[in-house]
Design a protein with these regions (language model features):
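Conserved alpha/beta enzyme-core scaffolds, especially Rossmann-like or related mixed alpha/beta domains
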Residues: 1-44, 196-212, 216, 227-232
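Hydrophobic alpha-helix feature that most strongly marks membrane-spanning transmembrane helices
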Residues: 150-153, 194, 221
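Generic detection of long, well-ordered alpha-helical segments
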Residues: 16-19, 135-139, 182-186, 206, ...
């Protein structure tokens, strides 16, 4: 990141340092009767109906069971029939019934680790985050986080879900072992801007990463990204990705 001219604005925040905050918020949600303990296995959940996001939607089996908390219990947040409505800057208006879209979801895992959905909302609040930019494949996660954010009366955030990079319609990601060629940082930035359909002037292509970023901020245009969830890498961009494996 530093070689690309990307630096953080404040001190590094680690989730391991925020465990007490997570616990406090979880207790608040429990006190409002918004949670319950769940003993369902992954297999049971996988047999549930599929949501419109192509992932298992929980059937709320344990909602009224009143299971005592144990080391094997997950904690779920009750998803009522309220609508989540927000305007995404690239994907447009988002309107979902949280219960129909994702149903009751886990906020503390059965291994006693706080779930990402809860932790990231609290992290953003602690860091005074106002604008969230992420891949379009995480729109489903945003629905859950938006719901938690509202339950806790945290200030609304502005969202933008940008297209993800794909090769043959398969997501390019670190999770699948994909890497980036780090031999030419300026080229990486230029191709990244082209991927995001930004106009590139000839005189900026050989500039330093810092100069390229200044140019990108000044000339940023969101219009070409409207309603696009994924973009296939062009041959040059594929070469950058592929050459990292050689």
């Amino acid at each position: 990141l530093e070689s690309l001219g990307l630096f953080w604005d404040d001190k590094i925040s680690r989730q391991s340092e925020n465990l007490q905050e997570y616990k406090n918020i979880l207790e608040i949600l429990k006190s409002k009767n918004l949670t319950y303990n769940c003993n369902c296995s992954r297999k049971q959940i996988a047999l549930s109906n599929q949501s419109n996001f192509n992932e298992p939607i929980y059937n709320n089996h344990c909602r009224n069971m009143q299971h005592p908390l144990s080391n094997k219990s997950a904690v779920r947040l009750i998803a009522d029939h309220k609508s989540t409505k927000f305007i995404d800057r690239t994907q447009g208006p988002q309107h979902n019934n949280i219960n129909n879209s994702v149903s009751d979801f886990i906020i503390k895992r059965s291994d006693q680790i706080y779930a990402y959905q809860l932790a990231v909302v609290i992290d953003d609040q602690l860091q005074s985050v106002t604008n969230i930019v992420r891949g379009a494949d995480l729109l489903n996660s945003t629905i859950k986080q938006y719901y938690i954010n509202n339950l806790l009366n945290f200030p609304d955030k502005a969202y933008m879900h940008i297209p993800i990079a794909t090769i043959n319609n398969q997501k390019l990601s670190k999770g699948s072992g994909d890497k980036v060629n780090v031999n030419n940082f300026s080229l990486i930035l230029i191709e990244g801007l082209k991927f995001l359909k930004q106009k590139i002037e000839k005189n900026i292509e050989d500039a330093s990463p810092r100069e390229i970023l200044k140019y990108a901020v000044k000339n940023w245009d969101i219009a070409p990204l409207q309603q696009i969830k994924n973009i296939e890498l062009n041959p040059t961009q594929r070469l950058i990705a592929d050459s990292a494996h050689t």
